[in-house]
Amino acid sequence: MFGIFSKGEPVSMEGELVQPSSIVINDYEEELHLPLSYWDIKDYKNSWLKSLGEGLSNKTHSALAVSMYEPEKTNFIFTWVLYFEDEKVYVQNNVIFLEECHGFSPENINKFIESRTTHDGDGMKISEWHTDLNSVLDFYHSLNN
């Protein structure tokens, strides 16, 4: 199973309106709070749909933003990146540092994602999860509804 699912109504956390959500990757589940100051939940879903469509089409990767703020006024964006390898999909949590991404726009988020690596510069293993392509396709199709 794979997906990012909203839970209930938006709430205020530390003075910011957020959408309680969770990401599910097979047996793993992590709570998320999607900020709603720049994007609403529809914007997130449209971005995921576009990014997944691109990644599935070119069989490389898709970046699913889970903390979108106005790019000119923020330093980084949290994402979950899906790397497609045949029937397997590897999922890593990723931060896009906007100062390193000249010309960043949310519409082209996949262009600012590097190829999958399994170890960082210090040789430490990068945390990642995996799921199957059909689970990602199910999530992709659910975004159209």
UniProtKB/Swiss-Prot annotation:
It comes from the Bacteria. Induction: Not expressed under laboratory conditions. Gene3D superfamilies: 3.30.2450.20. It holds the Pfam family CdiI_N. Signal peptide: none annotated. Interacts with cognate toxin fragment CdiA-CT. Immunity protein component of a toxin-immunity protein module, which functions as a cellular contact-dependent growth inhibition (CDI) system. CDI modules allow bacteria to communicate with and inhibit the growth of closely related neighboring bacteria in a contact-dependent fashion. Protects cells against the 16S rRNase activity of CdiA-CT, its cognate toxin protein, but not against the toxic effects of a similar rRNase, non-cognate CdiA-CT from E.chrysanthemi strain EC16. This is Immunity protein CdiI. It comes from Enterobacter cloacae subsp. cloacae (strain ATCC 13047 / DSM 30054 / NBRC 13535 / NCTC 10005 / WDCM 00083 / NCDC 279-56).
